Amino acid sequence: MLNLKIRSARIEDAAILAAAERTIAETPGLLVSRPSELILESFEEKIVELSKIGRYVVAQKDGKIVGHALLDPMRLAAISHVFRLTIMVHPGFQSQGVGEALMRNLMDWATRTPQVGKIELLVRATNERAMRLYTKLGFVVEGRFRKRLRLPDGEFVDDIAMAWFPDR
């Protein structure tokens, strides 16, 4: 993707990030959160928090935010080397290299950051495109959470647990 820039998220990005996630959440099964559960203050707090203890980045194309991703460390000492990855490619920008660029940025940061020993993520079993990308980038399947997400129509979707270990 041409003109793609990855940068650290800023507090003034929070409204755009929240709005994008609300739009994505309108499609059942894409996110765990429902649109009404995605509030601006939570995004602002997460941006501030991860600027100190993790990483929160946005992808911009021609100045417009088109995706975002974060690495959030686990809080308990015994698993503090494990960082949870969350990634969103905003509507209309899938299959254009945004997700891969965000992932590579986070993985590069993780490789340079000694505190990161493992990155974990969950992906819907129905999201084959994302699973192919994660596998291409070196993530491995660690397990399956059956019937983890209940859709509004009562159906269930499995989540696949994947992980990546930085080379040092």
Stretch-by-stretch model annotation:
Residues A110-L122:
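Conserved GNAT acetyl-CoA-binding A-motif
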Residues I11, L30-G92, M103-R104, W109, ...:
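Acetyl-CoA-dependent GNAT
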Residues K5-A19:
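A short beta-loop-alpha structural element at the N-terminal edge
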Residues A19-P35:
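Helix-loop element at the rim of GNAT/NAT acetyltransferase active sites that forms part
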Residues F83, G117, R124-E128, K147-R168:
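C-terminal "cap" of GNAT-fold acetyltransferases
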Residues Q96, E100-A101, R112, A125-G143:
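Conserved active-site alpha-helix within GNAT-family acetyltransferase domains
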Residues L17, A59, V89, L102, ...:
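Hydrophobic packing within well-folded, soluble alpha/beta domains
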